[in-house]
A protein has these predicted regions:
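C-terminal motif of bacterial Sec signal peptides marking the signal peptidase cleavage site
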Residues: 8-10
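Predominantly five- to eight-bladed beta-propeller fold
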Residues: 17-23, 72-73, 152-218, 246-249, ...
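Beta-strand-rich domains and repeat architectures in extracellular enzymes and scaffolds
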Residues: 37-73
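Conserved beta-propeller blade repeats
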Residues: 42-57, 89-105, 132-147, 179-192, ...
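Short, solvent-exposed loop/turn segments at conserved positions within beta-propeller repeat blades
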Residues: 67-72, 107, 184-188, 254-261, ...
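Short loop/turn segments that connect beta-strands within beta-propeller blades
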Residues: 80-83, 116-121, 197-200, 267-271, ...
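Cap/lid segment of the alpha/beta-hydrolase catalytic domain
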Residues: 251, 413, 421-545, 552
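Active-site-proximal cap/loop segments of hydrolase catalytic domains
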Residues: 491, 499-712
Length: 712
């Protein structure tokens, strides 16, 4: 009996109690300016699901606790009445989706739940049973009789599998490429499981799936594709007889070298499949059927290996197989989309550094595009429709995501804000002003640059000024809101920010976007110098003696490169997750297609002029010209650009006698995602900039009157 009691006590000790969910933090902000703590107190609105029949919206919002260093995501259910959202329910979960019968399905802890209304106001959550894997995503068939479940499937033999007697060994034996991806060692692949579902059993308080079929059984292929793909890469036909899914049928070295994914149509009845995009060699992703099943749309890139190719909207007639490049003439990417009705698609795309919502409609046999949202300093993301009312997310450099609705009346867009998630914080702070400025580049072209001014801007004062270098490299400097690279945070610390849409960004035409691959040290760098030089020359408020240069990823590469070419312009540098040594990066990065395309080839290809130019411009080759303090930041779980790049840059600076700091995160990837690490990042960032860019007047008893610290 004593042994049983001891065992019971041991089990009880090992049991981990479920942590209390994080709720909306309450914060009082001193000084009326944005702080790192205020950033992490903000609610973050995510997924939006629309029940058009019942005029309801479900959306997620995440809250963070800095002391507990974790977050909780909540699902909110709201009725849309008279242009306002009335909250009717709230619970912990993610990935909400409405069923045909008006129930709400959602994920929590690797399980799928159905939030069910009972008599009166009572609700109940029914868990799906019969599936023994963690569910990472799901997609219900239109009639709810079938469901696709996303789950990880083991694809690599572990050391313990190979040597059962070495079950505590931590070493890995690797014999092919793609052994790591983004921030994980590749051991599993997400695959779609088709199952039968009887939603009527909800009334009996039970819901079970049966008759599983893994659409990729016996393969190591992914669907959806890692690292960021979700259920948007799957689609049901309206009658539930077909499933369209995205898949790159490659593994190992072949996978690492190619972006050639395809759209496959799986016949639920015969279990046969066909590839409808075999003729296209680049990415084909995110299929979606029209409501009547007459068309299927998807996003398509033309060239294999070019992950930043123009993302085109393609539409195929399901009866004839005729394909149409529907977004031809737009000269920018289609970023996300949905079918509004049988012949209308709503999507967003960036143009001149703002994400806008467009409509692609079939008229007289032709697909025609019209802009829906007005011009302005905002980014929009379409979510769906309730009748003729569009639901979208909107953010800007001055505001995090909020949900909006709009209607088109007499050719005009009438906008209405539905959520006010962070009003309690905005009401306590003053935001900086954002100004667009067109600048003439060294080759005579026009470049749009955002200028962000401090709050309470004094036109008679000079401010230290930062040149911001964007990552990607093919990512737009749009009206984004970041919880790390936040321009309002920089301006709140009394910095002017110069953020150019330099060469190699979408939203200014295909030619502009492509003028960076194979030319990292070329026109894009001249564009950076144009941006800061032109602003300093024409702004009496820019302190030309206290300029800084900051950036992440390709922006970090830019900082390392500029450090060896800036001709004494800058007094401080910060590089986050940047490339320092291009030759090492070519071999270290996991997605080799990117290295081959953007670098132009391998450094051992001596007759390849583009590749040789790329590697000749590696920042590490110009360390002898470094002369300015630099902060190097990196995450050790970053497998896109390894942390040894920052360590090498830091070591080089110290060995050259240049002031330098290194901030390393052992458990962060290409981003910084944990609250306390995020605040450490901000404090280190501004401490470094303030040290070198904000002159401090010394005690007049120790110096001549008005003399400043020469070390600043």
């Amino acid at each position: 009996m004593a042994g049983i009691a001891l065992l019971a006590a041991s089990c009880a000790k090992e049991a981990t109690p479920e942590k209390e969910p994080i709720t909306k933090p309450q914060i009082t902000i001193e000084g009326g300016r944005l702080t790192p703590e205020a950033l992490w107190a903000m609610g973050r609105i995510g997924n939006v699901a629309i029940d058009a029949d019942n005029q309801r919206i479900a959306y997620t919002v995440s809250y963070y606790s800095v002391p507990e260093n974790r977050s909780t995501t909540w699902v909110r259910i709201c009725d849309l009445k008279n242009g306002q959202l009335e909250q009717t329910d709230e619970f912990v979960g993610s990935d909400p989706a409405w069923t045909q019968n008006g129930q709400l399905a959602y994920l929590k802890g690797g399980k799928l739940y159905f939030h069910v209304k009972r008599a009166g106001q009572r609700t109940e959550d029914i868990v799906l049973t019969g599936f023994d894997k963690d569910i990472e995503g799901f997609l219900l068939s239109p009639d709810n009789s079938q469901i696709l479940l996303m789950a990880e499937v083991k694809t690599v033999e572990s050391t313990a599998d190979r040597y059962p007697d070495l079950d505590k060994a931590t070493g890995r034996v690797v014999d092919d490429l793609m052994y790591k991806h983004w921030d994980e060692w590749t051991e599993t692949a997400p695959q779609p499981f088709l199952a039968q579902l009887d939603e009527n059993n909800i009334e009996n308080k039970q819901l079970q799936v049966s008759n599983f079929v893994n659409l990729l059984e016996g393969t190591q292929y992914e669907s959806p594709m890692k690292p960021f793909g979700g259920v948007e890469q799957w689609a049901w036909s309206p009658d539930g007889t077909e499933i369209a899914y995205t898949c790159r049928t490659k593994i190992g070295l072949e996978y690492a070298l190619s972006t050639n994914s395809d759209i496959y149509i799986y016949d639920v009845r015969t279990r046969m499949r066909k590839n409808i995009t075999q003729d296209n060699l680049g990415y084909d992703t995110n299929p979606s059927y029209s409501p009547n099943g007459q068309y299927i749309a998807w996003q398509s890139m033309e060239r294999d290996g070019y992950e930043s190719d123009e993302n085109r909207l393609f539409i195929m007639n399901t009866a004839t197989g005729e394909k149409v490049f529907a977004s031809r003439g737009l000269d920018t990417n289609v970023d996300s989309y949905y079918w509004k009705d049988d012949s209308t698609i709503v999507f967003n795309g960036v143009w001149h550094a703002t994400e806008r919502i467009y409509q692609c409609s079939l008229h007289n046999g032709e697909w025609e595009i019209a802009q829906l949202t007005p011009d302005g300093q905002y980014d929009y993301e379409p979510c769906g429709n309730i009748g003729n009312t569009y639901i979208c997310l909107r953010h800007s450099m001055r505001e995090a995501n909020e949900i909006y609705q709009f209607r088109i009346e007499n050719g005009q867009c009438e906008l209405n804000q539905l959520t006010f998630e962070n009003k309690n914080i905005y009401d306590q702070i003053e935001m900086g002003r954002v100004e667009p400025r067109w600048q003439t580049t060294t080759d005579g072209k026009q470049m749009l640059t955002w200028i962000i001014y401090p709050p309470h801007f004094d036109p008679n004062k000079k401010y230290p000024t930062l040149l911001y270098c964007e990552g990607g490299p093919q990512s737009p400097v749009s009206q984004f809101w970041s919880f790390r690279w936040n321009f309002m945070m920089m301006s709140a610390n009394d910095y002017i920010v110069v953020a150019p849409n330099r060469r190699g960004l979408p939203g200014f035409g295909k030619e502009w976007n492509e003028e960076i691959s194979g030319d990292y040290g070329g026109q894009c760098m001249r564009d950076y110098f144009t941006a800061i030089d032109e602003f300093v020359a024409h702004s009496p408020n820019a302190d030309k003696d206290h300029l800084g240069c900051v950036g992440a990823s390709f922006g970090g590469f830019s900082v390392y490169w500029i450090a060896g070419h800036h001709d004494h312009r800058f007094k401080a540098f910060i590089a986050h997750d940047g490339i320092f040594n291009m030759e090492m990066q070519y071999l270290e990065t996991e997605e080799k297609w990117f290295a081959n395309w953007d670098m132009g080839g391998a450094y051992w290809e001596k007759d390849n002029a583009v590749a040789q130019c790329t590697f000749a411009n590696s920042p590490h080759r110009f360390v002898d010209k470094w002369d300015t303090p630099i902060l190097c930041i990196h995450g050790e779980k970053d497998y896109r650009i390894l942390a040894n790049q920052a360590m090498a840059a830091f070591d080089a600076a110290k060995m050259r006698g240049i002031p330098a700091e290194l901030l390393i995160f052992p458990d962060e990837n290409h981003w910084v995602l944990q609250p306390q690490n995020g605040i450490l990042w901000q404090r280190t960032f501004f401490s470094w900039l303030d040290r070198w860019l904000k002159p401090v007047v010394l005690d007049p008893r120790e110096t001549k009157c008005g003399e400043t610290d020469p070390n600043r």
